[in-house]
């Protein structure tokens, strides 16, 4: 099944487009929130509801770990049955080209996670030596 990778407002549109170029050759697609009907100004709960309303298989990418701490957002994420990865804080301090190359480098690990039953949230660290770790959702 074709996977759609959703990048929220806590990620750069350039990151979504760059990773999207790689994903396209695998038969997948990347979308930044600015390009979806819900729009760039949608709240986290609004975009979660939008993704759940489609028949697509989504993997969300965010730089905002608060999804797991905010009760309403956590409940909406679970209700929507979403799969997600959180980029560790170090991503925010890293140039876009390195963010993209690191996500692409780790893509086989990330794609393996998509086979797990939703909902789930994993943190992807910025270091090669660190493993991807599951976050409570």
Residue spans for each PLM region:
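Acidic, metal-binding active-site segment of PIN/NYN-like and related structure-specific nucleases
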Residues: 44, 51-74
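A general structural motif
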Residues: 2, 57, 117-119
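Conserved beta-strand termini and adjacent loop/short-helix elements that scaffold enzyme active sites
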Residues: 33-35, 87, 124-125
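Charged phosphate-binding loop/patch that engages nucleotide di/tri-phosphates or the phosphate backbone
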Residues: 110-137
